[in-house]
Amino acid sequence: MEFVRLEVSTRDEYKGAQEPVSFVRRGKEYHVEQILDRWYEGRMDSTRMPLLYFRVRTHSGEIFILRYHEFFRSWSAVARD
């Protein structure tokens, strides 16, 4: 699975980068209407970097998988045409 970097705005309360609220992809801004699913990867394995995944639906009805890399504090999405 290939990912592309994104600019993401998040809901930050007691800690940073909790949930995505909007993101910009290829110059277009998308607003997250609903978080359909979330999961974590790499937290139990000290040899892997912790990653947070969010499957989201936008206001336009499109579905995206967003990923937050905790170490680099960067967001990306599954690359699709």
Predicted segments — roles?
Residues 1-81:
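Cysteine-centric segments in proteins
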